């Protein structure tokens, strides 16, 4: 499930409807990137944390970390809207989706699962936070060392959970 031109939904998505939409119970989700449209995908960019100056990086082998080099190709990320305020985060070069596992680890999944959706919120300080939809009290976070922080160790008000979305051109 997921990828260009195919339907995207939760692991419980039951059937494909006319026009390529997927039905998940009584909720219909549109294809992630339909032919000739962006399907809720935003222009690729970078996510920089103000804590250590790291860019969130998704590796092709599934690892997730932070790096300070703005030229690293694996920091190019694409947000895809799933619902109002809910996004998935795709590593463009890695062709993988950011996921939070049940033990709080961050990794990159080859396909979209229910662990790949995050509530995106613009905080009062103008930074964004990404809170797991499945594990609702856990956030995407980077430590000052550039390593990801376990979701179970995160919470509101921590600097580690703040990100500044930036254009890939800047």
Swiss-Prot record:
SUPFAM superfamilies: Cytokine. The modification Omega-N-methylarginine is found at residues 4, 6, 8. Monomer. Homodimer. Interacts with FGFR1, FGFR2, FGFR3 and FGFR4. Affinity between fibroblast growth factors (FGFs) and their receptors is increased by heparan sulfate glycosaminoglycans that function as coreceptors. Interacts with CSPG4, FGFBP1 and TEC. Found in a complex with FGFBP1, FGF1 and FGF2. Interacts with FGFBP3. Interacts with integrin ITGAV:ITGB3; the interaction is required for FGF2 signaling. Interacts with SNORC (via the extracellular domain). Interacts with glypican GPC3. The keyword Lipid biosynthesis does not apply. Belongs to the heparin-binding growth factors family. This is Fibroblast growth factor 2. Acts as a ligand for FGFR1, FGFR2, FGFR3 and FGFR4. Also acts as an integrin ligand which is required for FGF2 signaling. Binds to integrin ITGAV:ITGB3. Plays an important role in the regulation of cell survival, cell division, cell differentiation and cell migration. Functions as a potent mitogen in vitro. Can induce angiogenesis. Mediates phosphorylation of ERK1/2 and thereby promotes retinal lens fiber differentiation. Keywords: Angiogenesis, Developmental protein, Differentiation, Growth factor, Heparin-binding, Isopeptide bond, Methylation, Mitogen, Nucleus, Phosphoprotein, Secreted, Ubl conjugation. Residues 9-21 have a biased composition (Low complexity). One of its GO terms (biological process) is cell differentiation. The record marks 143-144, 149 as: Important for interaction with integrin. Gene3D superfamilies: 2.80.10.50. The modification Phosphotyrosine is found at residue 97. It is found in: Secreted; Nucleus. The modification Symmetric dimethylarginine is found at residues 4, 6, 8. One of its GO terms (cellular component) is extracellular region. Residues 143-159 are annotated as: Heparin-binding. The gene is FGF2. There is a cross-link at residue 110 (Glycyl lysine isopeptide (Lys-Gly) (interchain with G-Cter in SUMO1)). Its main location: secreted. The keyword Cell inner membrane does not apply. One of its GO terms (molecular function) is integrin binding. The N-terminus of isoform 2 is blocked. Phosphorylation at Tyr-97 regulates FGF2 unconventional secretion. Residues 1-21 are annotated as: Disordered.
């Amino acid at each position: 499930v997921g990828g260009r031109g195919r339907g995207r939904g939760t692991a419980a998505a039951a059937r494909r409807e006319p026009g390529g939409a997927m039905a998940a119970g009584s909720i219909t989700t549109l294809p992630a990137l339909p032919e000739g449209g962006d399907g809720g995908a935003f222009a690729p960019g970078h996510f920089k944390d103000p804590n250590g100056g790291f860019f969130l990086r998704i590796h092709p082998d599934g690892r997730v970390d932070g790096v300070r080099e703005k030229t690293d190709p694996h920091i190019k990320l694409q947000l895809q809207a799933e619902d109002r305020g809910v996004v998935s985060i795709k590593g463009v070069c890695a062709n993988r989706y950011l996921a939070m596992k049940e033990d709080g680890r961050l990794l990159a999944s080859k396909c979209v699962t229910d662990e790949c959706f995050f509530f995106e919120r613009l905080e009062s300080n103008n930074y964004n936070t990404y809170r797991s939809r499945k594990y609702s009290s856990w956030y995407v976070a980077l430590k000052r060392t550039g390593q990801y922080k376990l979701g179970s160790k995160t919470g509101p008000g921590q600097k580690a959970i703040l990100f500044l979305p930036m254009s890939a051109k800047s």
